[in-house]
């Protein structure tokens, strides 16, 4: 398989609240506004397919086609409007998700007839949903918004705001996105000037995420340099063991229950020698949404423990467009992805690859001066199974799992 094809497959496979940050006393204040947007129905926005999508009134029946979109809707408090969504281990951390109608196959593909039968007012389709599926729904008279892909945390912020406009929850969306953006900026600022360790993000099957990806941006915001750059990998692709060894990463990052690379060639790297391997939540690192701040905090705390310990985020410093009934419609395409945060901590079961992981969903509140629950951190030893033929097959199956996770 060529590197180009492999890269495309990897993108499809992987792309599928503010956590651990103390909010400053100004957190209860509104974010600084720099422009206005139309938040009154009807709303017309241009989607990733170039279609002008009009939502005539606040949707009462919403379908989400991927876990990331579901996460955002829950984050905005609009979960009661959801009538259909992916109902599986990748959305089980969302309260009440099991009561919704499942609209995807085991492979994460949309079930067109089921969706049409739900008579939705609006379908939210992340970019991993094919244009063909979107057009099938539109041909049946269904209103569908297909989002642009998220290649940075900034994209997540913009998608959250747009989702709020489409659902009639823009004020909540600006608050959620401001908290997300403030946390990210706080970690970036806290690690500015510090020595940046090198990091290898091991996705399994030899794949990694480059700097021009959502995951790569998380690594950068945590104050580290991605070894994928040395292999000229910008998005998702395979990276050779030789390059990893040559770059000698200070840290190796894995997600969920993915095995820690134990190739003998890596045994002399600093990461293995110093037992510097960190594990992040598989769903939150692969679902572009507000919960991205959880793996961000996990990584920043591992890479820069002293700097990350006292990080304080101030949402009041974040600029965001304010609603205006007479605002001109933006000429650029806007989009939104998905994220969610429950108002109470809960322990849920999430399947990663072929194993089950118990993960604690963090408490995210809107109270001033409150330190949010810390994301689950797990520093591991380098004694995972090697990548033999069987392990390679498992890795490929796991990659398919990540597609459904997004």
Task: Identify the residue ranges that each predicted region occupies.
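Extracytoplasmic substrate-binding proteins
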Residues: 130-203, 228-230, 281-330
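Juxtamembrane/start-of-transmembrane alpha-helix segments at the extracytoplasmic/lumenal side
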Residues: 378-391
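Short helices/loops that flank or line small-molecule/ion binding pockets
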Residues: 110-120, 139, 238-248
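Bacterial Sec-exported substrate-binding components of ABC uptake systems
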Residues: 2-70, 170-200, 302-378
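C-terminal membrane-anchoring or membrane-association module
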Residues: 391, 397-406
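Short helix-initiation/N-cap motifs at beta->coil->alpha
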Residues: 47-50, 101-113, 150, 231-241
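A short, structured surface patch at a secondary-structure boundary
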Residues: 42-46, 61-128, 133, 142-143, ...
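Alpha-helical, coiled-coil/dimerization segments enriched in small aliphatic residues
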Residues: 208-236
């Amino acid at each position: 398989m060529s590197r180009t094809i492999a890269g495309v497959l990897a993108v499809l496979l992987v792309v599928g609240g503010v956590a651990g940050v103390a909010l400053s006393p100004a957190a209860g204040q509104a974010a600084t506004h720099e422009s206005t947007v139309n938040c009154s129905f009807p709303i017309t926005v241009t989607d990733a397919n170039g279609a002008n999508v009009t939502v005539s009134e606040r949707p009462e029946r919403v379908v989400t086609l991927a876990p990331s979109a579901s996460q955002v809707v829950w984050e905005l408090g609009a979960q009661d409007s959801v009538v259909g969504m992916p109902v599986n281990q990748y959305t089980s951390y969302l309260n009440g998700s099991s009561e919704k109608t499942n609209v995807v196959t085991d492979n994460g593909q949309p079930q067109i007839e089921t969706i049409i039968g739900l008579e939705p007012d609006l379908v939210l389709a992340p970019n991993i949903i094919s244009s063909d599926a979107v057009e099938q729904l539109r041909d049946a008279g269904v209103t569908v918004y297909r989002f642009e892909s998220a290649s940075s945390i900034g994209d997540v912020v913009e998608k959250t705001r747009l989702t709020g406009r489409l659902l009639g929850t823009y004020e909540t969306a600006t608050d959620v996105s401001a908290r997300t953006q403030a946390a990210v900026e706080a970690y970036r600022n806290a690690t500015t000037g510090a020595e940046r360790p090198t990091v290898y993000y091991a996705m399994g099957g030899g794949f990694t995420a480059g700097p021009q990806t959502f995951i790569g941006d998380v690594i950068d915001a945590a104050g580290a340099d991605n070894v994928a750059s040395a292999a000229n990998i910008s998005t998702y692709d395979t990276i050779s063991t030789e390059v990893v060894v040559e770059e000698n990463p200070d840290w190796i990052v894995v997600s969920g229950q993915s095995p820690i690379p134990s190739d003998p060639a890596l045994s002399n790297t600093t990461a293995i020698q110093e037992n510097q391997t960190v594990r992040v939540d598989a769903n939150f690192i692969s679902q572009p949404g507000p919960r991205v701040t959880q793996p961000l905090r996990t990584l920043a705390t591992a890479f820069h423990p002293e700097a990350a310990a006292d990080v304080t985020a101030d949402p009041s410093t974040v600029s965001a467009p304010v609603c205006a009934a007479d605002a001109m419609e933006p000429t650029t395409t806007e989009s939104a992805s998905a994220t969610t945060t429950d108002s109470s901590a809960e322990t849920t079961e999430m399947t990663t690859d072929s194993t089950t992981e118990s993960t604690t969903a963090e408490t995210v509140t809107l109270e001033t001066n409150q330190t949010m629950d810390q994301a689950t951190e797990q520093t591991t030893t380098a004694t995972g199974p090697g990548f033999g033929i069987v392990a390679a097959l498992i890795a490929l199956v796991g990659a398919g799992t990540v597609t459904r996770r997004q």
